[in-house]
Amino acid sequence: MDLKFATFSSEIELPFYSALFSSKLDHDKLDSSARPVLGLYEPRSHASPEASTRMQILGSALTSDQDESGPLGMTRAEGYIKNVNTIEEFKNTDKNAMIKKAGEQIWDAIQDGTIYSCPSLLASFRILSYADLKKYKFTYWFAFPALHSEPQWKRTGPIGRLTSDESTALVERIGTWRYMVDRREHGFFLAKKVRREAAGPRSSLDDPGVDIGYRWDIGSLRDFETGFFNDAAEEDRYVAFVDPSNYPEYPSWPLRNLLILIRQRYRLNKVQILCYRDTQPRRHEARSTILPLAMDQVGDVELKCMPKVTGWERNGNGDLRPRVANLAEYMDPTRLADQAVDLNLKLMKWRLAPNLDLDAIKNTKCLLLGAGTLGSYVSRNLLGWGVRKITFIDYGSVSYSNPVRQPLFKFEDCHNGGKPKAIQAAEALKEIYPGVDVEGYALSVPMLDHAIHNEAKTKADFDKLKELIDSHDAIFLLMDTRESRWLPTLMGKAANKIVMNAALGFDTYVVMRHGAAPNDGSEETLGCYFCNDVVVAADSMKDQTLDQQCTVTRPGVAAIASALLVELLTSILQHPLKQHAPAPVSTGTGSAVSYERDPPDHPLGLVPHQVRGFLSNFQNMVIRGKSYPQCSACSKPILDAYKEGGWEFVKTALASRDYVAELSGLAEVQRLAEKAAAEMQWSEDEEGMDEEEGEGELI
């Protein structure tokens, strides 16, 4: 009777897809080289015959090394997966060449004897796949390469079975043998019966239980060539393999390659195959079968060339076509969002910026002072870069003029006086991406030249602001007024934080990073927003007309400035010195000004100090400015007084901007300027003037 075989069918655990997607995105990138993958199979007595021969790919299949074989009782199979970059590459891959190459690996191992070190190659497989990382679809095709026997092996007698006692003794012997050999040998082995008269008296080391009249001896496949069967009768010799098939008459797929080994290495054309289907917990069930096989006589048992190879898996409809797994149907939406947010960022590392440190950006905790137009755009850009921690501070409410310019708010947010901006901005960001850790605080930032009406509340606001600045890495100054930025500038410099600032005009903007305290003990650093001021910031809202009270700018200015500000932050985070990175120095003059990367391998380019933009002529200027020794916000006297006095200093400063001017030295600068102006004599060229009028000087 011709021998038929039960083919393997693939069974992939969901975690494997995630592991493969992650590996492709983070490690393999454009590399589509085949990489090892571990397959597992096992006898499953409870499964129907059609569902019994499963090649299982567990979640850890990509990372399991050669010493691992999965859960107890499972047999390993050696596999490779080739995950290509496009669906067209998947379609155009030469499938015949691929399975032929897999068959050659088995054939060569049989020919040179290395199969004895890794018998699990006899159950090897290949996977051709394409992972669509955007749509979470996985197109794949398994191949289980099988070498054809020609002439075919045939069953020469009835299928044999073991008794329950024989099966129990066999399972115990196999279990003992497996402890002594490599796990790759567990699926294929030799077995023989050693009769009692040959074995001598029964010892305490023999199988426990009922005396079956013989004992089982188990050996590795290589032992055949060293005389393992020499002392056993022909009817007591078995070549065995772990058989997951539950078909009564059909053994599983790995037997096909084992029969080639038997012919090539053992030079046999007649053999008893032990289809080992028993397991330790159910060893008494005696499910294993014995197949007496033989093939027609041939002139030379040994094959001269590799036989035909087949084995591509059929899909669920029985067609020789690949399968498609739509993972979006099974994955948690929040987890899908997490992976989707990181997708475009990780793709940057494939070709364009392989040295980009995405974790440095992702783990940066950002505090946004202002949840209006700038705050809305900045927060969305931070989300785009994968930032996971964002906190808003704003004391205002959403008004009807806001939603069209501030993308975090809707019309409904304006009703009944408007929702608190900071709270609503946080909720909106959470709706956009549930994985973000976002909070909002309706907090009034104490401002210079604004009277303190409730000292307890103002101090509480100051304490909360200090707590938030201390617990974040990057501070964004995005408020409407100049004086509202003074205290956060001072506190950010004192805490040695990254301080980012954006300010808007009608068609102009400035985007800058504040200089951090130097690491080398020197006083020179980059300037802050206030370093160009010659007077201390005052109440800019006093006696203002409506067009001066509102932020009147061209609508696109805020989006441009916000994008540049976030891009500047990411460039800072890629620099080895972070906020202490020096500003680039220009080379060349005029229209030929250029800048060199520092360091040269910076993945994003320059880390400028300031970018000033002019929408009227669509130009940007990169500017570098030193800190001003008499700055009202970041000079040494101001910093020292704040560090020493804390709230008491702030209270005094808020109440009297003259105090800040005197302490910083700005007042003295003004006095010296006035004195110089008073002493300066203005003269005009006397040529051509009417001397009779006597007007030669003007004081």
UniProtKB/Swiss-Prot annotation:
<dbReference type="InterPro" id="IPR042523">
    <property type="entry name" value="Atg7_N_2"/>
</dbReference>
<dbReference type="InterPro" id="IPR006285">
    <property type="entry name" value="Atg7"/>
</dbReference>
<keyword id="KW-0833">Ubl conjugation pathway</keyword>
<keyword id="KW-0963">Cytoplasm</keyword>
<dbReference type="InterPro" id="IPR045886">
    <property type="entry name" value="ThiF/MoeB/HesA"/>
</dbReference>
<dbReference type="InterPro" id="IPR042522">
    <property type="entry name" value="Atg7_N_1"/>
</dbReference>
<feature type="region of interest" description="Disordered">
    <location>
        <begin position="680"/>
        <end position="699"/>
    </location>
</feature>
<keyword id="KW-0813">Transport</keyword>
<keyword id="KW-0072">Autophagy</keyword>
<keyword id="KW-0653">Protein transport</keyword>
<dbReference type="GO" id="GO:0000407">
    <property type="term" value="C:phagophore assembly site"/>
</dbReference>
<dbReference type="GO" id="GO:0000423">
    <property type="term" value="P:mitophagy"/>
</dbReference>
<comment type="function">
    <text>E1-like activating enzyme involved in the 2 ubiquitin-like systems required for cytoplasm to vacuole transport (Cvt) and autophagy. Activates atg12 for its conjugation with apg-4/atg5 and apg-6/atg8 for its conjugation with phosphatidylethanolamine. Both systems are needed for the apg-6/atg8 association to Cvt vesicles and autophagosomes membranes. Autophagy is essential for maintenance of amino acid levels and protein synthesis under nitrogen starvation.</text>
</comment>
<dbReference type="GO" id="GO:0034727">
    <property type="term" value="P:piecemeal microautophagy of the nucleus"/>
</dbReference>
<protein>
    <recommendedName>
        <fullName>Ubiquitin-like modifier-activating enzyme atg7</fullName>
    </recommendedName>
</protein>
<dbReference type="InterPro" id="IPR000594">
    <property type="entry name" value="ThiF_NAD_FAD-bd"/>
</dbReference>
<dbReference type="GO" id="GO:0019779">
    <property type="term" value="F:Atg8 activating enzyme activity"/>
</dbReference>
<feature type="compositionally biased region" description="Acidic residues">
    <location>
        <begin position="682"/>
        <end position="699"/>
    </location>
</feature>
<feature type="active site" description="Glycyl thioester intermediate">
    <location>
        <position position="550"/>
    </location>
</feature>
<dbReference type="GO" id="GO:0015031">
    <property type="term" value="P:protein transport"/>
</dbReference>
<dbReference type="InterPro" id="IPR032197">
    <property type="entry name" value="Atg7_N"/>
</dbReference>
<dbReference type="InterPro" id="IPR035985">
    <property type="entry name" value="Ubiquitin-activating_enz"/>
</dbReference>
<dbReference type="GO" id="GO:0006995">
    <property type="term" value="P:cellular response to nitrogen starvation"/>
</dbReference>
<dbReference type="GO" id="GO:0019778">
    <property type="term" value="F:Atg12 activating enzyme activity"/>
</dbReference>
<dbReference type="GO" id="GO:0005737">
    <property type="term" value="C:cytoplasm"/>
</dbReference>
<comment type="similarity">
    <text>Belongs to the ATG7 family.</text>
</comment>
<feature type="short sequence motif" description="GXGXXG motif">
    <location>
        <begin position="370"/>
        <end position="375"/>
    </location>
</feature>
<dbReference type="GO" id="GO:0000045">
    <property type="term" value="P:autophagosome assembly"/>
</dbReference>
<dbReference type="GO" id="GO:0032446">
    <property type="term" value="P:protein modification by small protein conjugation"/>
</dbReference>
<comment type="subunit">
    <text>Homodimer.</text>
</comment>
<dbReference type="Pfam" id="PF00899">
    <property type="entry name" value="ThiF"/>
</dbReference>
<dbReference type="Pfam" id="PF16420">
    <property type="entry name" value="ATG7_N"/>
</dbReference>
